[in-house]
Amino acid sequence: MEKKLGLSALTALVLSSMLGAGVFSLPQNMAAVASPAALLIGWGITGAGILLLAFAMLILTRIRPELDGGIFTYAREGFGELIGFCSAWGYWLCAVIANVSYLVIVFSALSFFTDTPELRLFGDGNTWQSIVGASALLWIVHFLILRGVQTAASINLVATLAKLLPLGLFVVLAMMMFKLDTFKLDFTGLALGVPVWEQVKNTMLIILWVFIGVEGAVVVSARARNKRDVGKATLLAVLSALGVYLLVTLLSLGVVARPELAEIRNPSMAGLMVEMMGPWGEIIIAAGLIVSVCGAYLSWTIMAAEVPFLAATHKAFPRIFARQNAQAAPSASLWLTNICVQICLVLIWLTGSDYNTLLTIASEMILVPYFLVGAFLLKIATSPLHKAVGVGACIYGLWLLYASGPMHLLLSVVLYAPGLLVFLYARKTHTHDNVLNRQEMVLIGMLLIASVPATWMLVG
């Protein structure tokens, strides 16, 4: 396997996966539920939590550098093969479904430039023209990654820099237009009629999703030129993303009063740019949104393909997915991922169904590995500092699972259950020496039993 990803490429991978479409709607989303005071508290709590998680990943890359693809291997090493498989399966499934949403968003954003009241070309990203365009983009990225992860990561670095340009312009203009009196207007949100701590909770329900992707460098750590860069890249990307989110949300409240900002249609950053620089502002943000989502899609495709590949090399996924091509790209895993994305795109067009519930449930599955990162560090830590970071990361991971909805976690067993067949088949393809132990049999039984009421609740 090639080990060519340097610090800049790893940092760009993490930053690009976190900075997707959400940042462009963050001003309105936050203003609708919270005052400036609540925002400051919410960002403070979340910032501390995500930094603890980033530090946990950094520490693990230093004390267990031999564990490549941490999201899967940390869970496997710490809690057994079945837990490791479920971590990898849930992460991969979430990445596939999220990639479908990215492709839909790209062509929904393109409709800003193409659609008129008389002509609906791309619409909400689910017209046949959108599906054709999304399919073309899907396979262009597919063959790009087949040329080598390093090539794709280099292009992702350029895309990350490109997506930072409109965000940087927005921040500069917002600083120039910022008025402290506007920012302090109803500072504690009396007009919302909700206590400050309730507002804080509401902000954190939004904030918890904007750092999904923090694990990017850890996932591709096997391809890092220097293992020490993995932890550095994670920390640098988290600090950069946190800075962008803070500036975008707080400065916006100094440009437009909170009640007015809460009414701006999304992506609200476009409306603010029109306020600050005229009609061209909307075009700049629409273009920035497209570039940003394309970059995030590229990052997530790299990570989605890496997880089954690494799981297969550790005998958790069927042996075929351990194959690489001549350019050391995880070819079999990439084909699996993108064929699944293509099928989902076709189903969206054929059924016209709303897959937001499925996306929410799958997103819950990506939070479980975050908790397991903290739990693994807590399990193996020897120094008081490492134990403290592990405890903090565990608490943050549990908060993420609680805040995103325990019911969705229960429903996620519907998606875990089919994975058990993959797990059992993988053991057969690898001529696995170990039969199922008692713990694994109990866990499989619990998942199968829970999947019955969960399926009924989902379809009922």
Predicted regions: what they are:
Residues M1-Q28, A32-V33, A37-L40, I50-L58, ...:
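Membrane-interface "cap" regions at the ends of multi-pass membrane proteins
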Residues A31, G42, L51-L138, H142-L146, ...:
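Hydrophobic transmembrane alpha-helices that form the core helical bundles
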Residues P384-G460:
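A generic transmembrane alpha-helix motif of multi-pass inner-membrane proteins
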Residues M1-E2, L40, P117-Q129, L157-A286:
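Helix-loop-helix junctions that connect adjacent transmembrane segments
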Residues F72-A75, F112-P117, T203, L235-W300, ...:
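TM-loop-TM module centered on a large, flexible mid-protein loop between adjacent transmembrane helices
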Residues A31-S35, L39-L40, T114-T127, Q150-T160, ...:
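Transmembrane helix-loop boundary segments of multi-pass membrane transporters
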